[in-house]
């Protein structure tokens, strides 16, 4: 049975969906004003893995990941670029999809844009106003009154006094409490008309937190199974989502909360000021996308993930071992036999709070067994279980020879194969010095030759 670490209760719990056999999951997505960075990559890959495992476990999943396409940063960036909000956000949504596709991330079932749900947000704000949980501040913003929601702070495990003392919160004019947060931002004269919507409280735009409450309830209902996101969103974003949704609807918002850990770079926090900020595109210029996905999945999703070139290179070499086993022992197919002992250990790992670190260890056990036994069935298990994680779907030669998935051999392979043939002729003629010279020449160019029962094959070092 699947168990999930629930951030709300701070313990691992048996997963029981609201509707038997069906799961509804919402994940906070990207604010699209720039290219996605490594933190975004982790969120995308982690919850893609969660979605894949839920479906592999037989659940009928509805997966929603939103897009924030209206925000202070977006307005500022569009002004800097001299382009419309829609032009800017469309461009970065397309870039986000390109990055996600490269990382093997399947599209969610729904990918709502905040600007498409403004009416639903206004309806939710109106409900909060009717219940006395929201008020119009002196600057004409509509704010949520946290002191009116008795459970505020329960999610982050802090009292209101502790939160006021220890957290940096957005301050709006004439708030009743420093922790009160904006539901509706009154229009500013220096902002473009495309970010202004008519409302009962005057022209303006939604605050960040109300977006997710409105989109999730519209697509998944007032209560659903799983809500995910990065650890940085626990407070204030998810605390505020709970206050909004439970305040408006009067009952539990989400049953299981999941948060992935932070990404660090060379053991330091990733930030532009430290000069260690990397976009997904920066990393993919140097490493195969499947290596990046594998690197993310080697760690448990709740653990900190420390990025470095050395760690990515280690991931590349490890993934090479798995693909080498598939190349050496051609699998009969990629169907998983879930009654086989390795598959049972894989399932146990994944059912233990999506423990991909242990699941990946099972893949290496299978690779070692395939290399020892030459069993096509074992190789099929390896390929099939890897596929559950979104790995090992390519032809081994494509990965081992350094080509991207679907990328054709651009002629380099022909030249290398020609040298392999010359080496074979030299060996046949017992000119071992020439054979060794060819091997050394290729190795100097980063090409490793491996003699197998099926002939000589090559891969990148």
Curated annotation (Swiss-Prot):
Binds 1 zinc ion per subunit. ATP binds at residue 272. Disulfide bonds: none annotated. It is found in: Cytoplasm. GO terms for molecular function: ATP binding; cysteine-tRNA ligase activity; zinc ion binding. A motif ('KMSKS' region) lies at residues 269-273. GO terms for cellular component: cytosol. One of its GO terms (biological process) is cysteinyl-tRNA aminoacylation. Zn(2+) binds at residues 28, 212, 237, 241. A motif ('HIGH' region) lies at residues 30-40. The keyword Acyltransferase does not apply. CDD domains: Anticodon_Ia_Cys, CysRS_core. Its EC number is 6.1.1.16. NCBIfam families: cysS (TIGR00435). Belongs to the class-I aminoacyl-tRNA synthetase family. PANTHER family: CYSTEINE--TRNA LIGASE, CYTOPLASMIC (PTHR10890:SF3), CYSTEINYL-TRNA SYNTHETASE (PTHR10890). Monomer. This is Cysteine--tRNA ligase.
């Amino acid at each position: 049975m699947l168990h999930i670490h629930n951030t709300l209760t701070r313990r691992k719990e048996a997963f029981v969906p609201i509707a038997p056999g069906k799961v509804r999951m919402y994940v906070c997505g990207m604010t699209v004003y720039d290219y996605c960075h490594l933190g975004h990559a982790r969120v995308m890959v982690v919850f893609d893995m969660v979605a894949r495992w839920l479906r592999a476990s037989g659940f009928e999943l509805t997966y929603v990941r939103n897009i924030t396409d209206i925000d202070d940063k977006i307005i500022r960036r569009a002004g800097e670029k001299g382009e419309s909000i829609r032009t800017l956000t469309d461009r970065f949504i397309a870039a986000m999809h390109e990055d996600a596709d490269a990382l093997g991330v399947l599209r969610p079932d729904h990918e709502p844009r905040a600007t498409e749900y403004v009416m639903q947000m206004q309806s939710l704000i109106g409900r909060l106003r009717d219940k006395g949980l929201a008020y119009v501040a002196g600057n004409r913003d509509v704010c949520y009154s946290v002191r009116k929601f008795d459970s505020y702070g329960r999610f982050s495990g802090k009292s209101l006094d502790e939160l006021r003392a220890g957290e940096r919160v957005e301050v709006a004019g004439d708030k009743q409490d420093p922790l009160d947060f904006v539901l509706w931002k009154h229009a500013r004269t220096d902002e473009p008309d495309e970010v202004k919507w008519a409302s009962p409280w005057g022209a303006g735009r939604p605050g960040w937190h109300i977006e997710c409450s409105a989109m999730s309830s519209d697509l998944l209902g007032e209560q659903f199974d799983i809500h995910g996101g990065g650890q940085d969103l626990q407070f204030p974003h998810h605390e505020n989502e709970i206050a909004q949704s439970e305040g408006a609807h009067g009952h539990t918002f989400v049953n299981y909360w999941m948060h992935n850990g932070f990404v660090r770079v060379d053991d330091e926090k990733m930030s532009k000021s430290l000069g260690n900020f990397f976009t997904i595109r920066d990393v993919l210029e140097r490493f195969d996308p499947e290596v990046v996905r594998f690197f993310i999945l080697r760690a448990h999703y709740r653990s900190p993930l420390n990025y470095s070139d050395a760690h990515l290179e280690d991931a590349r070499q490890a993934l090479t071992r798995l693909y080498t086993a598939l190349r050496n022992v051609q699998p009969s197919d990629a169907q998983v036999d879930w009654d086989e002992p390795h598959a049972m250990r894989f399932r146990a790992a994944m059912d233990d709070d999506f423990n991909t670190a242990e699941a990946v260890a099972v893949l290496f056990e299978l690779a070692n067994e395939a290399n020892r036994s030459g069993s096509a069935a074992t190789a099929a298990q390896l390929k099939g279980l890897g596929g559950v994680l979104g790995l090992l779907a390519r032809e081994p030669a494509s990965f081992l020879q350094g080509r991207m998935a679907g990328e054709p051999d651009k002629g380099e392979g022909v030249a290398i194969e020609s040298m392999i043939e010359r080496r074979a002729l030299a060996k046949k003629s017992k000119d071992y010095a020439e054979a060794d010279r060819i091997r050394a020449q290729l190795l100097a160019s980063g090409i490793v030759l491996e003699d197998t029962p099926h002939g000589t094959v090559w891969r990148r070092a």
